[in-house]
């Protein structure tokens, strides 16, 4: 048989099977590289209480950092990283309710703070305004983070009126500096908690304030980091919170037949949301429940959208929380609002709290 007549033989190449585990590993690496890195920094006594509580309840995908001038308090706090600022200045004894000492302590430890914030995409800074460390150091930390190109959102409480005029003056000083150095400052007026629950014992009132801080930070963080029914993209959050000034928060919940609409109404009419929201530039809606229906989510979003500026950017997400059972909870963060707690002319830094102009943090009479 000649070569030309030889039968043709098909040479079969064995198929190369790529193990599924290798593909999954590669996908995991890609997801790890692209996911948003979110840091939560608790500053001072109240801020450290907040991050301590966050460590207890758990926050998916966030690095928790505790910062204080008081070594004894810092020792008790749970966090992924702890930073004692101003070691030379305060010797670990605290700031003595003096924001200037808190500010200088943060500046002394600027390199350590900068190293701790390296690599973040978004930084939450939480504190209670009115004391020394949180009031003085939080704006310095915000400035560091923002200069590093990180989306910087401060979540702060204002003191109860019963805490005295000095803490109110300190809070004025700290708030205007935070607005200057943060992309967004979410303000929670503690006095407004008395409208929500006027008969609360004082110790419980402070715990409720801490819990609202935790809900705000955890809620926004996990809409980005935690798998849910509807997640938010980090770029969506950036669009609503970048360079937005003052923001306020409202929370509502209901388990009635009209639970979705009632929860949305409660959130927008919450005493904590103490502003006219009609001119707001943005809104972030966090919906949570065990069995949220798409129709209910639509009712909530439409209700909020109708009540803000027609040009406002509205983003939303849904987290499934089995422990809520039949309850729907709605948290709304309204950004770019005009607040009675701070006005544009207050944004120039003051030399000391005592030299601040006579601008009252006006709390409506209860």
From Swiss-Prot:
Keyword Cell division carried by entry: yes
Keywords (A to Z) from UniProt: Cell cycle, Cell division, Cytoplasm, GTP-binding, Nucleotide-binding, Septation
Sequence ranges of Low complexity compositional bias: 355-366
PROSITE patterns referenced in this protein's UniProt entry, alphabetically: FTSZ_1, FTSZ_2
CDD domains to which the protein is assigned, alphabetical: FtsZ_type1
Biased composition (Acidic residues): 344-354
Gene Ontology cellular-component annotations: cell division site; cytoplasm
Subunit structure: Homodimer. Polymerizes to form a dynamic ring structure in a strictly GTP-dependent manner. Interacts directly with several other division proteins.
Name this protein carries in UniProt: Cell division protein FtsZ 1
UniProt source species: Pyrococcus woesei
């Amino acid at each position: 048989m000649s070569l030309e007549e030889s039968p043709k033989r098909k040479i079969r190449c064995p198929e190369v099977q790529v193990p599924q585990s290798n593909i999954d590993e590669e996908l995991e690496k890609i997801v790890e590289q692209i996911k948003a890195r979110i840091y939560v920094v608790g500053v001072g006594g109240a801020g450290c209480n907040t991050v301590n509580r966050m460590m207890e309840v758990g926050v998916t995908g966030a690095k928790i950092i505790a910062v204080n001038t008081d070594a004894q308090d810092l020792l008790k706090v749970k966090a992924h990283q702890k930073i004692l600022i101003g070691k030379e200045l305060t010797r670990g004894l605290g700031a003595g309710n003096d924001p200037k000492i808190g500010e200088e302590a943060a500046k002394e430890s600027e390199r350590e703070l900068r190293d701790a914030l390296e690599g973040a995409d978004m930084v939450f800074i939480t504190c209670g305004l009115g004391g020394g460390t949180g009031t003085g150091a939080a704006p310095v930390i915000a400035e560091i983070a923002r200069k590093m190109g990180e989306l910087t959102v401060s979540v702060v409480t204002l003191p109860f009126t019963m805490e005295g005029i000095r803490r109110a003056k300190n809070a004025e000083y700290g708030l205007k500096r935070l607005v200057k150095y943060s992309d967004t400052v979410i303000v929670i007026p503690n006095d407004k908690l008395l409208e929500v629950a006027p008969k609360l014992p004082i110790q419980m009132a402070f715990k409720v304030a801490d819990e609202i801080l935790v809900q705000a930070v955890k809620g926004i963080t996990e809409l980005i980091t935690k798998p849910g029914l509807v997640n938010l993209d980090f770029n969506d959050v950036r669009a609503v919170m970048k360079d937005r000034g003052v923001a306020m928060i409202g929370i509502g919940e209901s388990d009635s037949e009209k639970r979705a609409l009632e929860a949305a109404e409660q959130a927008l009419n919450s005493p904590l949301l103490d502003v006219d929201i009609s001119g707001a530039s943005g809104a972030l809606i966090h919906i949570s429940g065990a069995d949220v229906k798409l129709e209910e989510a639509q009712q909530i979003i439409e209700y909020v959208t109708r009540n803000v500026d027609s040009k406002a950017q509205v983003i939303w997400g849904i987290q499934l929380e089995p422990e809520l059972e039949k309850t729907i909870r709605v948290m709304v963060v309204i950004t770019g609002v005009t607040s009675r707690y701070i006005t544009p002319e207050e944004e120039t830094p003051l030399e000391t709290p005592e030299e601040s102009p006579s601008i009252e943090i006006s709390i409506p009479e209860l």
